Amino acid sequence: MDLKKSSTKKIVLAGGVFDIIHPGHIHTLNAAKALGGVLVVAIATDKTAQKMKKRPPLHNQELRRELVSCLSMVDNAIVGHEDNIFETVKAIKPDIIVLGYDQIHQEQFISDGCKRINLDVEIVRLQSPVPHLSSSEIEKKYGKDIHGL
């Protein structure tokens, strides 16, 4: 998917599970959108989401992609590649990769991986716009009740 052909604006790539969309996601995606002009969001596959969260996601990857694609700041939502984030990066060819404050990826790891695939990408780590608001915090507060919905 080469979005550069259709746009002179910078392409920003953000990623995540997005199983329980909350105001922290909205603020983060708005901040990501403000860095460029085209915001592409890569949704973690079900397998990756389960590895990251240590439980199956509430919604499957296609439903999560559909939910995120409905957000006004998102120009394109895709399901990411399994087990290799750089396959997704190579397909999108972003100018900027945005990392949320709570994402496990280190900037240097992303930078080194992009260099290996010959992409010159700016890495930006966003700070939490809504302190102490994350899917994990919501899950801690409501526990198993949220999974019984």
Question: What positions do the PLM features span?
Answer:
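Nucleotidyltransferase catalytic core that binds NTPs
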Residues: 1-149
